[in-house]
C-alpha cells in the first residue's frame, strides 16, 4: 500500500531545504543565517563562499540543495530566487567528560543545530 501524498506546506513559488544535524551551536549558526537572509541566491552564495566562519560551507551546501529543489522539483527560475527565510533550531547535545585534577571530571557539552532555508521566486512585478 502506497503512502498518501501530503499537501505541500509551502506556496507554489517556494522551495525548501532542511539540514538536521550540524555540529555547531545554534548561536554561531544563526550569525551565518542572518548574513544571507533576504539576499539574492547568487549574492548569498558569494557571502558564504568568502565567509571566515567554519559552518558557512555547510550552509552553502544547504543553499545549493534548496536551489536544486527549486529548479528540479518545482520548475522555478533560479535567476530570480531570493533567500526568503533562513532560520535555526536546536538539536541534540552530545555530552562528554573531560578529566580534571584530583580525579574529578567535568561535563563538556557539544551542541548540534539544524537550519531551514526557504527560497522564493520573485515575480516580474518585484
UniProtKB/Swiss-Prot annotation:
The keyword Disulfide bond does not apply. SUPFAM superfamilies: Ribosomal protein L22 (SSF54843). Keywords: Ribonucleoprotein, Ribosomal protein, RNA-binding, rRNA-binding. One of its GO terms (biological process) is translation. GO terms for molecular function: rRNA binding; structural constituent of ribosome. Belongs to the universal ribosomal protein uL22 family. PANTHER family: CHLOROPLAST 50S RIBOSOMAL PROTEIN L22-RELATED, LARGE RIBOSOMAL SUBUNIT PROTEIN UL22M. Part of the 50S ribosomal subunit. This is Large ribosomal subunit protein uL22.
Amino acid at each position: 500500500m502506497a503512502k498518501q501524498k501530503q499537501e505541500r506546506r509551502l506556496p507554489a513559488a517556494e522551495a525548501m531545504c532542511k539540514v538536521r544535524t550540524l555540529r555547531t551551536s545554534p548561536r554561531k549558526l544563526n550569525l551565518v543565517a542572518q548574513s544571507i537572509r533576504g539576499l539574492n541566491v547568487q549574492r548569498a552564495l558569494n557571502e558564504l563562499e568568502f565567509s571566515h566562519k567554519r559552518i558557512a560551507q555547510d550552509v552553502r551546501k544547504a543553499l545549493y540543495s534548496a536551489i536544486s529543489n527549486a529548479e528540479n522539483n518545482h520548475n522555478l527560475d533560479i535567476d530570480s530566487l531570493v533567500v526568503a527565510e533562513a532560520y535555526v533550531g536546536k538539536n541534540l547535545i552530545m555530552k562528554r567528560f573531560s578529566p580534571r585534577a584530583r580525579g574529578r571530571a567535568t561535563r563538556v557539552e557539544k551542541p548540534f543545530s539544524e537550519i531551514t532555508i526557504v527560497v522564493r521566486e520573485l515575480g516580474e512585478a518585484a
